[in-house]
Amino acid sequence: MNQSDSIVIIPTYNEKENIEKIIRAVFSLTKCFHILVIDDGSPDGTAGIVHRLMTEEFADRLFIIERQGKLGLGTAYITGFRWALEHSYEYIFEMDADFSHDPNDLPRLYAACHDEGYDVAIGSRYVSGVNVVNWPIGRVLMSYFASKYVRFITGFSVHDTTAGFKCYRRRVLETIPLSEVRFKGYGFQSEMKYTAYKIGFKIKEVPVIFVNRREGTSKMSGGIFGEAFFGVMRLRLDGWMRKYPKIPSATSPRIEE
């Protein structure tokens, strides 16, 4: 069996054009990563492709959880986090299936946590300018100013607050009360980062280039951005009123670019 301390969680819904390619790209890396696919009942046969790869080639490093219906990005990741913790992984990654996140950046996020000692590594589009390729300008501006808005309202100094390309050390996910995470859509990304920050975990932004999907259909919608926009007010209120758990060794929250 290929042993690994790291697992990449990939939520999917109708990703048949991308899923085999992204799995093979991750498994081609020198560093050994495992993959957990969380599929929300894709009618296009995404799960069937994963099962074929598990049976024919990757039984010891590729896994899948199939859910019934579209239950939300946040709940997909929380399901994956719990599975990863139960299976004793030390480094737990979030990544999209559509190549908007470059698999070649996974070792860089891993190094930030494993070698440099950070608790959370964020693949950041905005820490060194705007590094987005092939997105419509309206969407670039919406994403960029959404992150600016989160920073302004919460006082949270991460540049890319809505980024979905991350590495967590397991102790972060063991400490955050996953059952209390409120947001199911893309507001989930800001909530997880902000909660880790308030608890006192060390966070590093690693600059990456985000590339718009080459195949398949985007799952973004106005409702997703609405949740993220209005949810920020709740995050700020939580920052004032909520008692966050503290890690024993926590000092001042640290964010490094």
PLM region descriptions:
Residues E17-K21, D44-L53:
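Acidic helix N-cap motif at the loop->helix transition within catalytic regions
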Residues R24-F33:
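Short, acidic, metal-binding catalytic loop of nucleotide-sugar glycosyltransferases
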